[in-house]
Structures are given as structure tokens and as C-alpha cells.
């Protein structure tokens, strides 16, 4: 059975999106990619894959910044968010494709880095949210009456009402 949206626990983005942790994961993955690519004689592919990971992180940071600025307005518009997203994605995609074209075939690592970052972002965002949701459903929920006392009749007499 699914939980209705109004009953779902609120999960703040700060719980899910941790850019510093993502940065260190990206650096580690870029180092591994460079090591593996270097073993096969294509060190630049690993470097470009790392660049793609960093471009993906830049995109995620820009998403957070634009979402914060747009939702801070009194009447945020979906149109401004959509326009901002489309222009940002277009710029990063064009930049990635230009790098891939100029430095081909090794530059294609940028495109793979961007794609891999999206998978990484979903994984590192979804896992903490799922963990938070799981712990929220395991904790007992206290109910309060109109006089501010917790629900249940344990330890109370009938005259307490």
C-alpha cells in the first residue's frame, strides 16, 4: 500500500544532497578511472571522465542554487524553473559535446563522466532518503489530544477527561 503524498514524511534536500561528499567521491572515481585508463594506455580518457564528473557536480550545484533562489520568491513560477533548467542543461551539454569533439576520441570521456555522474547523483541522493523514510516509519508516532497530552489511556483514570 502506498502512502498518500500529504501523509509522507518531509525529507529536506540537505539530508539528501551532500556536495562535499559527492566531490570526494568524484575525485576518487576520477583517480580510479585515470589509473584504469592509464593501464590500458589511454590516460586522457580517464582525465576527461573526471572532468565530466566535475561538470556534473557543477550542474548539481547550479540546480540547488537556482531552486533556492526561485523558491525564495513569494510566487515561484514553474516557467522560470523550466527555463533555467533548460538553459543550464543546454550549456553543459554543448560544452561537453564541444570537448568530446575537439579532443576525440579521448574527449568522449567527458560525456561518459556526465552520464555516470547522473547515476551517482541518483544513488547518493536516493539512498539517504530511503534510509530516512525507513527510520521514520519504524519510529512510533505519538498522537496528541486537544489538551496537549499524548494519546492513549494508560496511566489515566476516567476522571482525567
From Swiss-Prot:
Positions of the UniProt region annotated as Disordered: 141-161
Transmembrane segment boundaries: 22-42, 43-63, 89-109, 110-130
Cellular component, GO, one term: plasma membrane
InterPro entries: ATP_synth_I (IPR005598)
Top-level taxonomic group: Bacteria
Signal peptide positions on this chain: none
Main location: membrane
Keyword Lipid biosynthesis: no
Localization annotation: Cell membrane
One of the Pfam families matching this protein, by short name: ATP-synt_I
UniProt keywords, alphabetically: Cell membrane, Membrane, Transmembrane, Transmembrane helix
Bilayer topology term: Multi-pass membrane protein
Other remarks in the entry: Was identified as a high-confidence drug target.
Family indicated by similarity: To M.leprae ML1138.
Name under which the protein is recorded: Uncharacterized protein Rv1303
UniProt source species: Mycobacterium tuberculosis (strain ATCC 25618 / H37Rv)
